[in-house]
């Protein structure tokens, strides 16, 4: 049994590819040799939609509700070099584990805010984002 402050975290490595399991559920997959490679199909689809909508030079402001190992914001920060990403992660343990384990970009490229998504969104009133990604899971469901 886990709590939001103390989930069970495990990384399974397959060569340069790392899959983060949170409480036994696959949560993120990062290819450390090519962070633009996205293993999860829904992330591939979201990336196709973003690339079809915006030029790679677009200075996008993206809000990610949920982050885990931050595979999607890391990939997008490389595919859209002028983009800035704010990740809202409910678990401080997951956020610090991701920062310690992976070579994630630092602020201002990729900021990680700890908190419950609704509360953080309320604190961001007056801010604007070009894209908002809902990527928060509880167990194996959204």
Regions found by a protein language model. Name each.
Residues 1-54, 78:
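Rossmann-like AdoMet
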Residues 37-142:
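The AdoMet/dcAdoMet-binding core of the Class I SAM-like
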């Amino acid at each position: 049994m886990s709590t939001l402050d103390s989930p069970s975290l495990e990384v399974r490595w397959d060569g340069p590819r790392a899959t983060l399991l949170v409480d036994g559920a696959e949560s993120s997959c990062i290819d450390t040799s090519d962070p633009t490679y996205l293993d999860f199909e829904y992330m591939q689809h979201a990336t196709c939609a973003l690339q079809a909508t915006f030029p790679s030079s677009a200075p996008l402001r993206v809000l990610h509700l949920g982050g885990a190992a931050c595979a999607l914001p890391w990939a997008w920060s490389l595919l859209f070099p002028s983009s800035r990403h704010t990740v809202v992660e409910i678990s401080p343990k997951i956020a610090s584990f991701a920062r310690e384990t992976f070579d994630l970009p630092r602020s201002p490229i990729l900021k990680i805010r700890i908190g419950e998504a609704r509360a953080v969104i309320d604190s961001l009133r007056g801010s604007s984002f070009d894209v908002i990604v809902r990527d928060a899971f509880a167990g194996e469901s959204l």
